[in-house]
């Protein structure tokens, strides 16, 4: 069956001398693998639509075995991302997480839209950390191991959330903090912001401003949390660990400042 599918290339792999095997995150059938015949040939029409992070409209033959791309049309090349080492590193991280955590052909239009909107944001804005954090939290929820952020993970209390416990799987209130002496201190305001990031559509967020140390704290929490519950080694994270990102001061638009 020939299907018209809009999607984003999240992984590519050489297949034989002239072909590519690509992984596409789509708005119609979720994540799937497809063979792009001749895509490694320099003059192939397939070469342009099988580059990493390309958003394209694919005409794909979906069969019982490996799907095959018949043709494609580039919708958005995200050129700025692909020409910027920092933005490329972040999107590579997002793409690898998505590939590792999503089951094949399990459609989720909302998550796909968040992935696409995050790429648009990164392509057009200087701020890259926070949109990725927002997507990451939603992806954890889809994968079934989201942290408890709206209430205490021990007693359900929604007030006085002051510690994040990797061991307990989320926030702890002041009364339950003793359950994990190694829990990470986090302000109540920042904990509320983290919960907001996990729930809200990126399109509803204006420009975002956060102190660099708070961004780094959230990143530390999510890294340690993923290491405990994620189950897959993420190769691209090593590149992020080696990069010191500039967090700009955003002066215009809606902002969250903590």
Swiss-Prot record:
GO terms for cellular component: bacterial nucleoid. Keywords: DNA damage, DNA recombination, DNA repair. Pfam families: RecO_C (PF02565), RecO_N (PF11967). GO terms for biological process: DNA recombination; double-strand break repair. Transmembrane segments: none annotated. InterPro entries: ARFGAP/RecO, DNA_rep/recomb_RecO_N, NA-bd_OB-fold, RecO, RecO_C. Belongs to the RecO family. HAMAP family: RecO. Involved in DNA repair and RecF pathway recombination. This is DNA repair protein RecO. It comes from Oceanobacillus iheyensis (strain DSM 14371 / CIP 107618 / JCM 11309 / KCTC 3954 / HTE831). The gene is recO.
């Amino acid at each position: 069956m020939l299907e018209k599918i809009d999607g984003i290339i999240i992984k590519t792999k050489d297949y034989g001398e002239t072909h590519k095997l690509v992984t596409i995150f789509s708005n119609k059938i979720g994540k799937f693998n497809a063979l792009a015949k001749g895509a490694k040939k320099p003059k192939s029409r397939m070469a342009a639509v099988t580059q990493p992070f390309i958003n394209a409209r694919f005409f794909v033959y979906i069969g019982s075995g490996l799907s095959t791309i018949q043709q494609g049309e580039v919708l958005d090349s995200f050129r700025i991302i692909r020409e910027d080492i920092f933005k490329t590193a972040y999107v590579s991280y997002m793409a690898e997480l998505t590939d590792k955590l999503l089951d094949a052909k399990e459609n989720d239009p909302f998550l796909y839209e968040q992935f696409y909107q995050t790429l648009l944001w990164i392509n057009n804005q200087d701020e890259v950390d926070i949109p990725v954090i927002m997507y990451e939290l939603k992806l954890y929820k889809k994968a079934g191991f989201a942290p408890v952020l709206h209430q205490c993970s021990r007693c359900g209390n929604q007030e006085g959330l002051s510690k994040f416990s990797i061991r307990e799987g989320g926030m702890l209130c002041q009364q339950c903090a003793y359950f994990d002496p190694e829990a990470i201190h986090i302000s109540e305001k920042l904990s509320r912001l983290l919960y907001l990031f996990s729930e809200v559509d990126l399109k509803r967020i204006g420009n975002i401003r956060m102190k660099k140390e708070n961004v780094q704290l959230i990143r530390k929490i999510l890294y340690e949390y993923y290491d405990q519950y994620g189950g897959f080694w993420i190769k691209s994270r090593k590149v992020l660990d080696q990069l010191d990102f500039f967090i700009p001061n955003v002066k215009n638009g809606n902002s969250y400042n903590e």
